[in-house]
Amino acid sequence: MIIHFTLNGAPQELTVNPGENVQKLLFNMGMHSVRNSDDGFGFAGSDAIIFNGNIVNASLLVAAQLEKADIRTAESLGKWNELSLVQQAMVDVGVVQSGYNDPAAALIITDLLDRIAAPTREEIDDALSGLFSRDAGWQQYYQVIELAVARKNNPQATIDIAPTFRDDLEVIGKHYPKTDAAKMVQAKPCYVEDRVTADACVIKMLRSPHAHALITHLDVSKAEALPGVVHVITHLNCPDIYYTPGGQSAPEPSPLDRRMFGKKMRHVGDRVAAVVAESEEIALEALKLIDVEYEVLKPVMSIDEAMAEDAPVVHDEPVVYVAGAPDTLEDDNSHAAQRGEHMIINFPIGSRPRKNIAASIHGHIGDMDKGFADADVIIERTYNSTQAQQCPTETHICFTRMDGDRLVIHASTQVPWHLRRQVARLVGMKQHKVHVIKERVGGGFGSKQDILLEEVCAWATCVTGRPVLFRYTREEEFIANTSRHVAKVTVKLGAKKDGRLTAVKMDFRANTGPYGNHSLTVPCNGPALSLPLYPCDNVDFQVTTYYSNICPNGAYQGYGAPKGNFAITMALAELAEQLQIDQLEIIERNRVHEGQELKILGAIGEGKAPTSVPSAASCALEEILRQGREMIQWSSPKPQNGDWHIGRGVAIIMQKSGIPDIDQANCMIKLESDGTFIVHSGGADIGTGLDTVVTKLAAEVLHCPPQDVHVISGDTDHALFDKGAYASSGTCFSGNAARLAAENLREKILFHGAQMLGEPVADVQLATPGVVRGKKGEVSFGDIAHKGETGTGFGSLVGTGSYITPDFAFPYGANFAEVAVNTRTGEIRLDKFYALLDCGTPVNPELALGQIYGATLRAIGHSMSEEIIYDAEGHPLTRDLRSYGAPKIGDIPRDFRAVLVPSDDKVGPFGAKSISEIGVNGAAPAIATAIHDACGIWLREWHFTPEKILTALEKI
């Protein structure tokens, strides 16, 4: 069929299949703003176009409908080197993070302002209701529209976007646009899917329909015979190597319990066979031709089921220890299933697979018996949480190709260096023959720390020599991605009558699902990032992680902290009620203070025993709680309005800024001959603005404009090693490495500048904009670099920095919530939510606020509406965004505020600490305690639903 239509003002004539999907058609025409986030359901809005004057999801159209149509995409909004009014406002406000659906947002907002000059909040919400944004938190979009409206009348107009910090510094703590925001909002090619070549093969995966089963027969011959099928990978022809999908520093503190393909299926969606074909259509047809038979086994679905004496064993294969094998290993292995498979454990992590225990750890300080004996009151409560999904707008994706004898991996990953190490080992190549290019990442939130499809894609290319694309569908994100661990946490508190704690005990049990990636470290962070908030002389913790047959779990922003913090905050609030003490008052009586030793952290390691006891070197909780109390009007009356009851709640929170004594970051900075700089950073910017942090840190040290600094990051051929984007390590680790590299280069510039000026080094200094200034005059960075590169020069000037540390930098914060609960219907309305956070010196204030809003809204979603649900046989019923319940713009609190409260930390660069993760840690307990304040019930399992409200009120 030949169709005629207008695209961004230009007439088009195309020969198409009448039923061809318009999103795919436009993307293949180079309209990279029209992206697919939700398998064509039109829920996410990443595929928004203007179709005959109306905003429409391109995925919901077929090619035949384009006949005589007028189509506009986000590519029409500005020129290639010039942003439109709305695009510029988005960049200036700092709303662009991962950027994947920001072109669609720009198009929708532009259309709104073309129709309505000054839209109301309700009109804004309606216009953006079809867009799914997982990272920005929506609140800043109101600022975008406010700024765009103001600039329509006055192009120079400004609004208050974010406060500034540190008057003693030039660029740190000041507004500066995110360095990659412009190309993202313009939809310039920067994601993995934008790099795929026309000759690329496609992988489609046949997945297990059973939660627990053995493959008894597998025949792929018919699939292999289908024209266009290039290769089929199964357990019969994949590498016989065991690994963990968790992208962590070696030796990994997780069981190496995964083979690329195995004989045993451990969850619905587990890998059976991968078809590599010339097209997606051929690959999908080939999947139907694979003949497979299973012996279905009873699944293990919960922590309690995994603990049962007669529980099926999820990992029944023999275990091999690299070091520290237990005395019982030989006996345990004598009872193992002999299928030619095994598991490897690098060092003792408390794993007992025959008992379905993937990992465990115990520790304590003080005398627990004495602590509880000294208590006037003792309470013990158990709290449960469900499985939640990260839902990045860009699903997992990888594109691999050969470049001569080298394997090139274009990846949407948080850990390019760990990915290279793992893939090289699996495909049998040396690391220097594997080149990982971290493209822009359309959202990760922890899930892209795990290596979930890259190794299959790489192996397919190595076997066939062909370029290969492997991209998850949204359904695969739910059944084959890693989600947040299910947890069951029991807290026992002893306290005096005044509420001061005498003993704290936490039993943290986690459900890791079918594989043990992060099975030690995520649950360890439950107590590690909650117990230190309330220092006590007598503390005991037990962490036990169980295998099961639910869909996989792994890294998710917060990394165990939300579960532990919910339990300790709720238990303390229940203690306060029993003692008739105000919740905020009991927090004040027990909370951590600046400079205080965090003794319990001397007993909790993250894959390694602690070497010292850290302290809260910087902590702004006193000011945070003062401001929060005032903002929420904590003690003011809460009038009842019919069935609606008002309540207020609070939770304090903390996080780390990297993993001391385990992780490392490196950086190199090169002075160019015109006085500009190129930074080669190993860090992985996944939308958090790390490249902008590195830019500003280098500019601050080198006294040059930030625009004179260009950052190359996350590319294993063009940067130095960095552990990657996890553990909130970007600013402190990658940032400090950049600071050290800049300081190293600064000394070289000063030395050679002094020589050129004929002055002692002690008499010269760097000065903005990019000069060495002495008593006799000054010389530009460009002149110094040029002299170095002449035939008689001293060579190129390069600075390097390597950062390791034994020290912690802890960000702190508090969440305040006000809810209205309808005691007749059970409806919960979140009217106010305030997130106040101490991230030290905010390097990029507007980006920091965006990080807080996004993380906090994800936490609100986990608390109010999100859950992966299963049937009794282990089939996940939640397989798309429509049924999952992640919040959109209409779901945010009416009064939603993020506040930066600074402190000065000695570990982070220029006093900075992390910001991206801590925001997810406190919403659930703040909301739950507000619900209790409203109607007197304790919800000990989250998320919170009207049904749970009415059940607790004994109305159903």
Where does each model-flagged region fall?
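C-terminal catalytic domains of large/alpha subunits in multi-subunit enzymes
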Residues: 236, 428-435, 463-468, 497, ...
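Helix-loop-helix junctions that connect adjacent transmembrane helices in secondary transporters/permeases
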Residues: 318-427, 593-676, 696, 804, ...
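Conserved beta-strand/loop scaffold segments within soluble protein domains that form the structured core
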Residues: 294, 419, 438-440, 445-538
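Extended active-site and interfacial segments that coordinate phosphate-rich ligands
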Residues: 183, 288-295, 299-301, 414-417, ...
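Intrinsic disorder at enzyme termini
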Residues: 105, 128-192, 627-628, 635-639, ...
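Glycine-rich loop/linker segments at domain edges
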Residues: 94, 174, 180-186, 247-251, ...
